């Protein structure tokens, strides 16, 4: 069935025209297919001045049709601002803090293609952007610098200021990319549950994120934290990976801490006693690695707002550390570059307040002819610096391969 859907996506005449056009568009992988958003009537660039107004606006909106929603992303820095955490980092390429779009056309690709559109006539301007690689990838910090940050955080862990913290490294090159081409290649080689692509006039994002941060339908909310990574080998399988995670003290500690933190985050917005683990400590398999996952759910308190839920759940604890606020403060003291999209969240908010957001990891950001790929691995009390540094490369590998 997956191949059949891929075939329809690739060769449907309408979609081919859309892919080859200059229209901004978004593709989001869903459980049984893909949703494509385009013909945007509004584009909201988030900032400190408008983030509260944007989130509060959903309390007054009415849902009448499928296109009554916003789709887009929150960057890492704007989420810190929402929590009242100061950031003094600088970025070579100052990127958007977050962008949300109001679509007038949504194309749902399942066994068949369904189009929901407020546009009477579809117009396409032919456009094709080839991929150009102008320089090789360079890592923003070498191992010696990483080790220095690692040692600082290890000391903070021994002092009890944090229990786990995730150090970010970036691969960066000079390039322009065709995001449509990159996205479908990635879906063929490394499709993940929360994959997405954004093609805008002056930037693009391609992601094979595996992690669902929150899924809200009505008063029910679900989160699926990932904590635990194992590199694949020729002999490994899900059973051997599960055995490894269960027998590995470091991985078990890390997973338990993150699950407890996500349960705590949910408890702040849910009815007391309703937060529960639906599926505990199972393995998901990807091209280069295995992940250790738990599914948690709860029933939202009556009258809970979109802003309250976002502030409670973001940034996702599994890619930050524990406890969240103090760990964010420590990270921002040591990381000298903006994370931009990395460890932010992409998804949609419907006018009926249903929403779905991932954690933005395993992603390429292309902006001003520069591509950057970020990765982060967890530091706990008994972590080894070299192993965590190398794990970042494993996580970035499937994206780096797209540029070959």
Language-model features: where?
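Extended alpha-helical targeting/anchoring segments
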Residues: 1-404
